[in-house]
Amino acid sequence: MKNTDFEQIYKKYHKNLLVYALSLCGDYDLAQSLVQATFTKAYLSYKEGGSLRFWLSKVLKNEFINHIRHSSRYVDDPDIIFERLSAPDNPLDILIKEERMREVAHGITLLPNNYRLVLMYSIYMQLKDEEIADIMNTRPANIRKIRSRARQRLKEILIERKWGDKYEEDW
């Protein structure tokens, strides 16, 4: 892989992989380490063919599983999942948007594992149902059903936590 190709791949996928890693481990430093290991493997061993996004997400998941095996512990309490968003003109808009993202991200962490994974793969990694089904060893129809149930449960969680007023119209 050429350095220029690698730089473009890094720029394109870094943020999504970081969010996905944060959803898995809940630790920003560990998430950065997992993403770095993923890109190192991509640089050293990726061969053309197939979906690069799918391949990167699978490598990241495997890196996380390897980390769990080696450390024998799982952290499931993320304080902050999203980095600062690109700054709009109004600082108040920044704060509102970041707070809303944190609330939704925290709500996602409260979902059952299979719901959380399907949402993370769908929303943040933007994988197709078939790719998610391959990762999770199920059928695409099941992925659609799980995603629908996950969105409904997330809405319920947000409403239960008194965040519902501002989310009612979005769903």
Each language-model region and where it sits:
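DNA-recognition helix of helix-turn-helix
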Residues: 136-161
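Structural recognition of an alpha-helix C-terminal capping motif at a helix-to-coil junction
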Residues: 19, 33-40, 44, 50-62
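Arg/Lys-rich amphipathic alpha helix in sigma70-family domain 2
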Residues: 51, 61-78, 97
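Short helix-capping/turn signature of helix-turn-helix
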Residues: 13-14, 23-24, 120-127
